[in-house]
């Protein structure tokens, strides 16, 4: 099945896998999904990610992270903000705060994909890809 928005597909797969407490989630491997996975790993929301396969069959295997004995997922909600039909951009002064700073916004900037906090520190704006909390 062809997917037009690989990032939305990735977020949906993570959301569904965390609800049923799966450890590993396969997502399509693109530069954007790898960059978002790197940000999630740096923020401590996933354990790791690995590239697997060749060509069109390349997959990114994300290892989700859970807390406590009840295995509560660290990622409780993911929301796609900018989408192919309606792009959302924010300059450095308009960068959103997610849940008053508890969550993160993932921003695609001229310096790469980063969190809203990193973008504020770097003084750059960009496309608001998604919210994670």
Swiss-Prot record:
<comment type="similarity">
    <text>Belongs to the universal ribosomal protein uS8 family.</text>
</comment>
<keyword id="KW-0694">RNA-binding</keyword>
<protein>
    <recommendedName>
        <fullName>Small ribosomal subunit protein uS8</fullName>
    </recommendedName>
</protein>
<dbReference type="GO" id="GO:0022627">
    <property type="term" value="C:cytosolic small ribosomal subunit"/>
</dbReference>
<dbReference type="GO" id="GO:0006412">
    <property type="term" value="P:translation"/>
</dbReference>
<keyword id="KW-0687">Ribonucleoprotein</keyword>
<dbReference type="InterPro" id="IPR047863">
    <property type="entry name" value="Ribosomal_uS8_CS"/>
</dbReference>
<keyword id="KW-0689">Ribosomal protein</keyword>
<dbReference type="Pfam" id="PF00410">
    <property type="entry name" value="Ribosomal_S8"/>
</dbReference>
<comment type="subunit">
    <text>Part of the 30S ribosomal subunit. Contacts proteins S5 and S12.</text>
</comment>
<dbReference type="InterPro" id="IPR000630">
    <property type="entry name" value="Ribosomal_uS8"/>
</dbReference>
<dbReference type="InterPro" id="IPR035987">
    <property type="entry name" value="Ribosomal_uS8_sf"/>
</dbReference>
<comment type="function">
    <text>One of the primary rRNA binding proteins, it binds directly to 16S rRNA central domain where it helps coordinate assembly of the platform of the 30S subunit.</text>
</comment>
<dbReference type="GO" id="GO:0019843">
    <property type="term" value="F:rRNA binding"/>
</dbReference>
<dbReference type="GO" id="GO:0003735">
    <property type="term" value="F:structural constituent of ribosome"/>
</dbReference>
<keyword id="KW-0699">rRNA-binding</keyword>
